[in-house]
């Protein structure tokens, strides 16, 4: 195997990270010469990055092929018509890069490929005998990310492995989904990632069920609620919890209005002379679900989760109502709103409030609130319905056992979906079943962010000196360097490099005319798992220095044994 000589390689390392780099992976990928920024959310992948990404892709391919996946390569440029068939041309909004050709035709750059793969299935699959099918590709995707940041964690151009399963029924989908879940677990384990699979929100993808694969890191932008006792885990967009019961007073026979001039926040109502604790307040929020008003009610000390509201309403998109949209509907401005006996729009109430009494809420009149509200009598009895709306908090009870939930930041590295017939029905992708009836194909969709695996590995595996790569995705298995300029050291190093190559070990040979300290520092920065140093004193005794990047003392290894030792280390870790 051919070694790469550092003196001839393009490895533009930097002493300092860019000023705008906030997370470890961004800082280190730039400093170690893996990436350079071309524009907001757009990166050049330099040779070291390309080597590591190729290894990630190879692992993904192996595990996809192992479950019967067949690799495609479909266009990144899509005509608008195919997205309009599924109804997602408008749903994707500003997140989609759109363009026109010279004839005025509408096109987009693909964010994902459900529509394109469904079109292939529609045109080519005719019978249940052709199913199941598992198709995948590893391809460039585009997303007009509004706030690109954090290096490779939030970008506008990225590489995705997207796979799609096609089955004749739900039972087949369940099997395909579990095959993908197991394959994902193998992929992430092989890439050196500690991960957790969590229940997730399907968003614009649709479907009946989805799971995200998350890496716990402060660089993540998702929040996961997990129980260490029973291993329940869910994105907070879907997570539920047990909330301690509140001891309410008997309340009043009917709600009583009282003046609250200038009081428009939960916090203000907590202050004297009112002194109403936030947990005794009803927070009433006005949203637009597919541009239709909906009222969401949570406890005053809780936060509304918009993903849960979207799920509860079944809407394609939800947004907070604009200030000018609220008074014509509610009769008051935000800060004085309530849902008592309100019937002019759909009202959704978090289940934790169902049996609350003696609550306080806005009176739908500026400067006034109501006390003594009985939720069941004054809200639910007038047409409101219960729906999971609140965001769970750390310390709340696990919904599955007596444990308590931990809530932590996490980074999504993969997402799998049971799409069902969402796309096949809208795009008329059908097959004949065993009884000769035309039925819509039952689909699943399964995505992995290739660059995110690289970035996540660095977030998990780094120290003050640089990257600490897992062996399987390191750009090289080993680096060989000399500790002096003497010709005999160079000759011995060349022989070690050749022996490593014969054993299949990928080597970066640091043949630069630099001090040993510089070479050691760069080796640590690049994160190459094995460092082999050839020095005068050790060589005189027939040894070379051996050190693992992930820690451990320097060992002296006989020159004739170092290649075998390295090969064994590589095999054990990959």
From Swiss-Prot:
Presence of the UniProt keyword Cytoplasm in the record: yes
Recorded GO CC terms: cytosol
Primary localization class, coarse: cytoplasm
Biological classification of the source: Bacteria, Pseudomonadati, Myxococcota, Myxococcia, Myxococcales
Catalytic reaction(s) noted: tRNA(Pro) + L-proline + ATP = L-prolyl-tRNA(Pro) + AMP + diphosphate
Record GO biological process: prolyl-tRNA aminoacylation
Matching SUPFAM superfamilies: Class II aaRS ABD-related (SSF52954), Class II aaRS and biotin synthetases (SSF55681), YbaK/ProRS associated domain (SSF55826)
Gene that specifies this protein: proS
Name assigned to this protein: Proline--tRNA ligase
